[in-house]
Amino acid sequence: VGLVDGVIEVFKPIAQSKSISLELNSEIEFVNVIIDIEMIKSVVRNLISNAIKFSHKDTVVMVHVKVQDITNENATGEGNGKEVLVTVSDKGCGIKKEDQGKLLNEATHFTTFGTNSEEGSGLGLLLCKDFVSKNHGRLWFTSEEGVGSNFNFTIPIK
């Protein structure tokens, strides 16, 4: 969790400059996870950066971290039956329903624009998905246009 704290502290001034609050809600204090720390930092940085980019002024970007049991739905065959779940939620512009299937698909490429006309290509998310997969985790999202998005990833606890 200290890893997530550090990334949040780096992004707080950026969020504040856009009148966005960046907050952490953690249900854990310490988890011993054998992972590529720089990879995890990259994933968290990308998800927070995107959330800030696509959030409206005077909203909150929330980072939630917890440990959960691995269920059949999200089983990877790795770890001890537990995984860390990180969720980055925003109340931004959301993703159009017709674009949601394209976002994590390597075969498609499209350009999006944030709330301040900042450009996004989705390539960072593809890299995040690849990084997480290589660590036996998953990355997925839910989104509603005009409401916001939740980007989630898991890493098994070893």
What are these regions (language model features)?
Residues 13, 93-94:
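Glycine-rich G1-box
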Residues 16, 21-31, 68:
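Conserved catalytic submotifs in the C-terminal HATPase_c
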Residues 51-52:
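Short helix-loop "hinge" at the ATP-lid/N-box region of the Bergerat-fold HATPase_c
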Residues 95-109:
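Short conserved segment of the HATPase_c
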Residues 108-119:
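Glycine-rich ATP-lid/hinge loop adjacent to the conserved G-boxes
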Residues 119, 124, 128:
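Short alpha-helical Gxxx[C/S/T] motif in the catalytic ATP-binding
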Residues 136-142:
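Glycine-rich ATP-binding loops of the HATPase_c
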